[in-house]
Amino acid sequence: MNFGATFWGPMISFALFVWFTMKYVWPPIQTAMADRQKQIADGLAAGERGQKELDQAKSEVDKMLREAREQASQVIAQANKRQSELVEQAREEARQEAERVLAQARSEIDTEISQARDALRKEVVNLAVAGSSRILKREIDAKAHKDLIDDLVKQL
């Protein structure tokens, strides 16, 4: 065996293999690895951007919810205030109406009392006139006079 041919033959074959690999095989592998590395980096960056956007969207949603709750609270407060105003207004109107009805009833009662007094006065006057005319028609004597007055008192 020849040491030179045995040694140099595989060395030259290996060198040709390395040169061929470096020239034709390695550049596409490096390009594929670089592309893959770029895709992974882009994917990670997109994931981070997506996470930031998600966090931002969550904060905006929370802010919108807080604002909506505040607006709802304000609307409820305004509705409660309006309800209280309406109830108070209705109470005041009812009180005024009750006072008006009461005043009208008092006025009607006073009118009826006045009419009853007038009617009673007229009746008393009529009875007095009737009694006087009866007294004057009869003789004036004490017993007849007393009987006539008793009769008038019974009629009252």
Curated annotation (Swiss-Prot):
An example Gene Ontology molecular-function term: proton-transporting ATPase activity, rotational mechanism
Gene3D superfamilies assigned: F1F0 ATP synthase subunit B, membrane domain
Topology with respect to the bilayer: Single-pass membrane protein
First-listed, main subcellular location of the protein, grouped into a coarse class: membrane
Pfam families: ATP-synt_B
Alphabetical UniProt keywords: ATP synthesis, Cell inner membrane, Cell membrane, CF(0), Hydrogen ion transport, Ion transport, Membrane, Transmembrane, Transmembrane helix, Transport
Subcellular location, record wording: Cell inner membrane
Entry keyword Disulfide bond: no
Domain of life of the organism encoding this protein: Bacteria
Positions of transmembrane segments: 4-26
GO cellular component, one term: proton-transporting ATP synthase complex
Family of the protein in this entry: Belongs to the ATPase B chain family.
Its job: F(1)F(0) ATP synthase produces ATP from ADP in the presence of a proton or sodium gradient. F-type ATPases consist of two structural domains, F(1) containing the extramembraneous catalytic core and F(0) containing the membrane proton channel, linked together by a central stalk and a peripheral stalk. During catalysis, ATP synthesis in the catalytic domain of F(1) is coupled via a rotary mechanism of the central stalk subunits to proton translocation. Component of the F(0) channel, it forms part of the peripheral stalk, linking F(1) to F(0).
Subunit structure: F-type ATPases have 2 components, F(1) - the catalytic core - and F(0) - the membrane proton channel. F(1) has five subunits: alpha(3), beta(3), gamma(1), delta(1), epsilon(1). F(0) has three main subunits: a(1), b(2) and c(10-14). The alpha and beta chains form an alternating ring which encloses part of the gamma chain. F(1) is attached to F(0) by a central stalk formed by the gamma and epsilon chains, while a peripheral stalk is formed by the delta and b chains.
Name of the protein described by the UniProt record: ATP synthase subunit b
Upper taxonomic lineage: Bacteria, Pseudomonadati, Pseudomonadota, Gammaproteobacteria, Chromatiales
